[in-house]
Amino acid sequence: MSSVTLVSITLAAVIALAVGLLIGFALQKKLHQNNLDRATQTAEGIIEAAKKEAATLKKEKLLEAKDENHRYRTQLEDELKDRRTEVQKSEHRLNQREDTLDRRDDTLDRKEQSLADREANLNKRQQQLDEREQDISSEISKQHTELERIAELTHEQARQQILDQTQSELTHERAVMIKESEDEAKEAADKKAKVLIADAIQRSASDIVAETTVTVVNLPNDDMKGRIIGREGRNIRTLETLTGIDLIIDDTPQAVVLSGFDPIRREIARIALEKLIQDGRIHPARIEEMVDKARKEMDDRIREIGEQAIFDVGIHNMHPDLIKILGRLHFRTSYGQNVLDHSIQVAKLTGVMAAELGEDVTLAKRAGLLHDIGKALDHEVDGSHVEIGVELATKYKEPKTVINAIASHHGDVEPTSVISVLVAAADAISAARPGARSESLENYLHRLEKLEAIANSHAGVDHSFAIQAGREVRVIVQPEKLSDDQSVILARDIRNEIEKELEYPGHIKVTVIRETRTVEYAK
């Protein structure tokens, strides 16, 4: 009984559960349907609202497009209006130009017609002149024939006679004019030059010491000579090879002589040798070390000398390499005169004269200091010291006035400024003053012979004499061959030839002597 009851209860429970599930499913479906209906209604509302909003937005965009289209059309109309106005103005200008061209065309036509008329008149006058010229030529020919008959001279003979007479008169007048002009120019120039040069010289004084090709190094004792020579002469050979200088060791007590034509190498050898003597250790390795130190010391010394030179002169802004080259001039000589001292003196003289003439004093000093800069390298580089100096000044971008002063101070080119002329004058003053330079006997004799040869090469010269150590040449002429006027021209020609062919310090006086003697004996 109990098992049947349990089954019944279980079955009832299952049925109740099934019925509950069916009822729950039905309720769930109903609820889902209601939610779906509400969602559908909401979606339809959203769609409807979107449609309304889209319609509104469409209307707004259409209105904006219409406004934009209206503005664009208005802008186009304004631009078209402006373009029409500009075109009208251009048409007006073109019309005006066309009218102007028409008027010019008319004017040219009138001028062309006028020129044609003038050409016709000129042709007519030319024809008349040709006819008249023929008549005159015929008349002149008749007159020539008549003159030849009367004068008993042909046309060529008369022409030659007139030319000879005219040439004689012109020669006399030219000689007189040359003498008067030279006298006036010399008088005025001498007065001004004497004032300038005297002032420049009295404000610039310097000592000039002649250099030689040898240097003497003192030794503490004669035993040092053997140490300098070294075993089998290896020390002296090493020193000579490294410096390029000859060491002369003779019987002179406590001294050795360094001989060489390059003063810089000779100075390097002197410094190295003195350091070796002071150190006491003399062997090839030590010699090489001391020579290297001497070269470095020499480079520093050259730079310091160059800097001191530009400081003494009072110039600045010079390229460092050019300053070192300038310092090398201290170890160069010209006819026994120290080139750097000479350059400093020229710079100061040029500056004084430039100040008197109102020129740029600093630029004048710069040109004077650098005028012989090429001599620092003329033994190492091909070319004259003038050419080398111009190349150096151009390389280091010196002013054009300085370059021209370097190029023209020996007369190789024409000076283009007053400063260039002053540099040449100062160079001559510094070189020509007594004691500044020495000259070899061979060169001196050659210059005297050349002076006399130049004078004797001219026609009408009897003989000549170079006197006063070559500062004057006296020319004796044959009076029957040369007149007084021709003597003036002869002196000028000899002067020009001397200036062209000879190099000399200062100036040379040319004196032409024409003497006529008449002797009669009373019996």
Curated annotation (Swiss-Prot):
Occurrences of domain HD (ranges): 339-432
Segments of this protein annotated with the region Disordered: 81-136
Localization, UniProt: Cell membrane
UniProt xrefs under InterPro entries: HD/PDEase_dom, HD_domain, HDIG_dom, KH_dom, KH_dom_type_1, KH_dom_type_1_sf, Ribonuclease_Y, RNase_Y_N
Start and end residues of each KH domain: 213-276
Gene3D superfamilies in alphabetical order: Hypothetical protein af1432, K Homology domain, type 1
Gene Ontology molecular function: any one: RNA endonuclease activity
TM segment ranges: 6-26
Single GO biological process annotation from the record: mRNA catabolic process
Annotated signal peptide: none
The enzyme's E.C. designation: 3.1.-.-
Domain of life, per lineage: Bacteria
GO cellular component entries: plasma membrane
Keywords per UniProt: Cell membrane, Endonuclease, Hydrolase, Membrane, Nuclease, RNA-binding, Transmembrane, Transmembrane helix
PROSITE patterns: HD, KH_TYPE_1
Family matches, as Pfam families: HD, KH_1, RNase_Y_N
NCBIfam families assigned: HDIG, RNase_Y
UniProt family annotation: Belongs to the RNase Y family.
Function (record text): Endoribonuclease that initiates mRNA decay.
Protein name per the record: Ribonuclease Y
The gene coding this protein: rny
